[in-house]
Amino acid sequence: MKESSLNYMRGDCALLATAVGDLSGLPTYGVVDVDDNIQHVFVYDESTDEGIDCRGRMPAGEIKNNIQGEGLSIRKVSIEELQQVFGLNSYSNEEWEEAEEEAAFLV
């Protein structure tokens, strides 16, 4: 497998979360700071109370670990919001395919 230019913990988390959500049907959530800026994006599985991101599945309460920002909280985010903040349409087909492969591994 070739080396990736994507970094799912530093900016490309919305791409991976969208791919995981598409595959699993689970909703997308964000870790937001005190000013409601999205610092990290993940998928939330309500049935197990777990978050899924590039680190794998973990208790939802731990999803904020190692995420920078003041007054972090979690809230549901829309695809439209992620498009506006992270520019999901700017990713190439190759990058989407790479994220979908990673998502399949995580789901």
Give the ranges of each region predicted by the language model.
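A structural boundary/capping signal
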Residues: M1-V107
